[in-house]
């Protein structure tokens, strides 16, 4: 392979000159350079400046690099290990294990991280619902197996907690293979997640890839492709249904913005890179389901300053089948998960996909919550006394629905001291239908807070000294 030398180092950007009488490395090729400490660094070609000079982005710290050092072209893009050997392990952007475990053997298959998206005739469309066990998601914004889901929210509203709960529930209940990709997030969260998964026994079915906050922008920009390449292999070669978790897709955009500025490109709206839509499209179009297998992707999307019109979350919206919007005002009310039931959407909330009963219950829940939102202005000015009896009933049921949409998470047990709950879709529909039909009007609203299925509400109310009058609710007490 061709050899060149470093002519300039500016932070993570390294300019390399190759002889003009030889073929230059292609864009996206990986180059190798050994620094004074004997460590091998990987650079990725991003621009051709002319006269044999290529501009590259380093995947690691450029400390110790200097002009004149020899650089070798590997002749191919960055390649990462794929297949069963990746399960239960933690990798960096280059596919090197970072969990302190043994090195992978030389016979482990590797694939390049840059690929074309599947062709149209290879794609498959599925209408099967993926049960998550989280009531608010399963009822109002059901996830499609093989679809793309975005978890939108500002700082500290619970995006990572929901992702961790989804990994737990899906691994325990469905036993599928997961790939978790940590893009530019806190190293502590990745560490906690690793040990939680190890303790719960789901690590053996999960591959983890991290490029966290402390990494150079090149690594944070490419680590999403590393995780995706591992997931694609399970889909295309093993023919499996894979879950791909990305936390956080905004950091992918943010790293792209840093790289763009370092490369000297003119910034676009709000300082983002001019290639924002292209970069997002190249990643998202590869996350899809084919006739061989599926990738169901769940992506956390940080919303800067809670502004949904920011180009980063707005560009991501276009690629998603379902959105779960997390709202700060619900956090302030102590409702967890803080999912906004009126703003969250799903293309699968259709009677032909979820069934007539599920659809009708979901629509009625949304209608009651919408009416409650409209009545809140009157309540805040004139008080509850000015409402009609029907309106008072709507407010009471809406508050019960709002509280019943909350539940305890398994992954939060160590913080709350309360056991988590997994609620099947059938139980979720039954519970909300009973509230809508007025069968639980005599129960106090506090009984609906942070519980699992509707049986838990009835038992909690009894502990509070209230026995339900409805025969169906009474039967639940007798059944215990």
UniProtKB/Swiss-Prot annotation:
InterPro entries: AAA+_ATPase, ATP-synt_VA_C, ATP_synth_F1_bsu, ATPase_a/bsu_AS, ATPase_alpha/beta_chains, ATPase_F1/V1/A1_a/bsu_N, ATPase_F1/V1/A1_a/bsu_N_sf, ATPase_F1/V1/A1_a/bsu_nucl-bd. This is ATP synthase subunit beta. It holds the Pfam family ATP-synt_ab_N. The keyword NAD does not apply. Disulfide bonds: none annotated. The keyword Lyase does not apply. ATP binds at residues 153-160. Belongs to the ATPase alpha/beta chains family. One of its GO terms (cellular component) is plasma membrane. HAMAP family: ATP_synth_beta_bact. The gene is atpD. Produces ATP from ADP in the presence of a proton gradient across the membrane. The catalytic sites are hosted primarily by the beta subunits. One of its GO terms (molecular function) is proton-transporting ATP synthase activity, rotational mechanism. It catalyses: ATP + H2O + 4 H(+)(in) = ADP + phosphate + 5 H(+)(out). It is an enzyme of class 7 (translocase). It is a peripheral membrane protein. NCBIfam families: atpD (TIGR01039).
């Amino acid at each position: 392979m061709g050899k060149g030398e470093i002519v300039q180092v500016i932070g993570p950007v390294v300019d390399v000159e190759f002889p003009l009488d030889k073929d230059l490395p292609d864009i996206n090729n990986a180059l190798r350079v050994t620094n004074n400490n004997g460590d091998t660094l990987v650079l990725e070609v991003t621009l051709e400046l002319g006269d044999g000079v290529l501009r590259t982005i380093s995947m690691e710290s450029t400390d110790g690099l200097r002009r004149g050092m020899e650089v070798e072209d590997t002749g191919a893009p960055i390649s990462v290990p794929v297949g069963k050997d990746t399960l239960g392990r933690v990798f960096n952007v280059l596919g090197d294990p970072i969990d302190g475990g043994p090195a992978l053997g030389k016979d482990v298959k590797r694939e390049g991280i840059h690929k074309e998206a599947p062709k149209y005739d290879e794609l498959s469309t599925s209408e099967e619902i993926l049960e998550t066990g989280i009531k608010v998601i399963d009822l109002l914004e059901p996830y499609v197996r093989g679809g793309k889901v975005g978890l939108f929210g500002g700082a500290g509203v619970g995006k990572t907690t929901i992702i961790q709960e989804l990994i737990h529930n899906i691994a325990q209940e469905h036993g599928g293979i997961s790939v978790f990709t940590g893009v530019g997030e806190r190293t502590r969260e990745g560490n906690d997640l690793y040990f939680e998964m190890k303790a719960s026994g789901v690590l053996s079915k999960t591959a983890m890839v991290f490029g966290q906050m402390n990494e150079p922008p090149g690594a944070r920009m490419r680590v999403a492709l590393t995780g995706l390449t591992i997931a694609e292999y399970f889909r295309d070669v093993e023919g499996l249904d894979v879950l791909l978790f990305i936390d956080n897709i905004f950091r992918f955009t943010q790293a792209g913005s840093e790289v763009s500025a370092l490369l000297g490109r003119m910034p676009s709206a709000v300082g983002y890179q001019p290639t924002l839509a292209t970069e997002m499209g190249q990643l998202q179009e590869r996350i899809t389901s084919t006739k061989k297998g599926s990738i169901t992707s769940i992506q956390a999307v940080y919303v800067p300053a809670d502004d949904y019109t920011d180009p980063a979350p707005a560009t991501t919206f276009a690629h998603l089948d379902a959105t779960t919007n997390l709202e700060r005002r619900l956090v302030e009310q102590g409702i967890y998960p803080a999912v906004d039931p009126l703003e969250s959407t799903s293309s699968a909330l259709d009677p032909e996909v979820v069934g007539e009963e599920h659809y009708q219950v979901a629509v009625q829940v949304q209608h009651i919550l919408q009416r409650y939102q409209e009545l809140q202005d009157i309540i805040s000015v004139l008080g509850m006394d000015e409402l009609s009896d029907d309106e008072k009933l709507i407010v009471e049921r809406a508050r019960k629905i709002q509280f019943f949409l909350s539940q305890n998470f398994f992954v939060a047990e160590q913080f709350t001291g309360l056991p988590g709950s997994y609620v099947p879709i059938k139980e979720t529909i039954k519970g909300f239908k009973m509230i809508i039909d007025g069968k639980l009007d005599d129960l106090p609203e506090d009984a609906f807070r942070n519980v699992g299925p509707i049986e838990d509400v009835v038992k909690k109310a009894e502990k509070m000294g209230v026995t339900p009058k409805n025969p169906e609710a009474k039967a639940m007490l007798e059944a215990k």
